[in-house]
C-alpha cells in the first residue's frame, strides 16, 4: 500500500483522537456519560469544547481527502511520490489544525484549514 493510501487510515483516526482529548480534558467524563456521549460533548466549554469542534471538522474533512487520494490513485497520472508527499502534507496540516484549535489560535487555524483544502484540491490537479 502506498503512503498516500496509509494517510487515509491516519486521517480516519484524527477525529476519534480529538474526541478522546475532549473527554479526557473535561476531567468529568465517566461511564455514565458513555450512554449518551453526544449530550455530554454538547455541555463542554473551553479546551474540551474546542477539541469536540476539531473532532467534528475532522469528520467533515475526511470524505473529501479520501476521495482525492483515491481519485489520484485510480487515475494514475500523478507520480506516486507526489501523491505520497501531498498525503503527508495533508496529515501534517490536519495535525497543525487540531493544535491551533486546541490552543484557540483562530486566525492561524483558518489559514491552516485553507492549506489543507488546497492540498485536497492539489490531488485533483496533479491527476488531471
Predicted regions and their residues:
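Helix-coil boundary and interhelical linker segments in multi-pass alpha-helical membrane proteins
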Residues: 1-7, 70-85, 122-128
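Alpha-helical transmembrane segments
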Residues: 2-18
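Core segments of transmembrane alpha-helices
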Residues: 14, 57-71
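Structural signal for membrane-spanning alpha-helices in multi-pass inner-membrane proteins
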Residues: 19-26, 72-73, 101, 120-127
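Transmembrane helix-loop junctions in multipass membrane proteins, especially transporters and channels
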Residues: 23-31, 77-81, 106
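Cytosolic, membrane-interface loops and tails of multi-pass inner-membrane proteins
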Residues: 24-52
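Membrane interfacial helix-start motif at the N-side
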Residues: 42-63, 100, 106
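Interfacial loop-to-transmembrane junctions
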Residues: 93-118
